[in-house]
Amino acid sequence: MRAVLLGAPGSGKGTQGERLSQQYGIPQVSTGDLLRAAVAAGSELGKQAKAAMDAGELVSDQIVIGIIRERLTQPDAAKGYILDGFPRNFTQAQALDEMLATLERPLQAIILLDVNFEVLMRRLTGRRTCQACGAIYNIYFSPPEVDHRCDKCNSDQLVQRSDDNEETISNRLRVYEAQTAPLVDYYEAQGKLYKVDGEDDITKIAKNIGQILETAR
């Protein structure tokens, strides 16, 4: 199975990607993780990516596509893969399709996790992390049993990330929406886009995605 998980920040892409990876025995390919690994390994593409990041620039699509290509030609991706976090826009989608065509391994399904803007805001602004043990909560959906106190270690150091404020998150979501609209149209035209209600519980979402992937095989 060769698939892409699309969704806004807070839509649950990472969680569903992990479940699909385990279920199908195929790698979850996150561009963020790939870039960090390439930089750490000191590969040629990793060096180019590091140079861009050190200069405060975005890593070019050409470099990212090259790193993805290297990853998808590894043995564990022979049966398929789940792309998480890429493509982010129309240009990247076209470049990805062109690269996959050279490998003769086109995408089979693009899963869009559809979540209401207000729900995304609550998911992201409500996140709290225990500084003592790393446990993660959400004050709206999965709060600690006692306000401001960690269930696991009893610490009162539950903090909100500095970039989890409403203004920053709202801007991130607006940018995502603007970039993703043409991407959705692009994959719909190919007949490969499937929308899944990302507000259901995690198990039901996973079941719905699994049914789609079985059909798309």
Swiss-Prot record:
Which of this chain's residues are annotated to bind Zn(2+)? C130, C133, C150, C153
Give an example GO molecular function. Answer: ATP binding
Query: Which organism does this record belong to?
Result: Nitrosococcus oceani (strain ATCC 19707 / BCRC 17464 / JCM 30415 / NCIMB 11848 / C-107)
What is the recorded function of this protein according to its Swiss-Prot or TrEMBL entry? Catalyzes the reversible transfer of the terminal phosphate group between ATP and AMP. Plays an important role in cellular energy homeostasis and in adenine nucleotide metabolism.
Please list every transmembrane segment annotated in the UniProt record, as residue ranges: none
Pathway field: Purine metabolism; AMP biosynthesis via salvage pathway; AMP from ADP: step 1/1
Q: What class of enzyme is it?
A: transferase
Q: Which GO terms describe its cellular component?
A: cytoplasm
Compartments annotated for it: namely: Cytoplasm
List the CDD domains hit by this protein, alphabetically: ADK
Q: Which InterPro entries match?
A: Adenyl_kin_sub (IPR006259), Adenylat/UMP-CMP_kin (IPR000850), Adenylat_kinase_CS (IPR033690), Adenylate_kinase_lid-dom (IPR007862), P-loop_NTPase (IPR027417)
Q: Give GO terms for biological process.
A: AMP salvage
The primary location reported for this protein is cytoplasm
The name of this protein is: Adenylate kinase
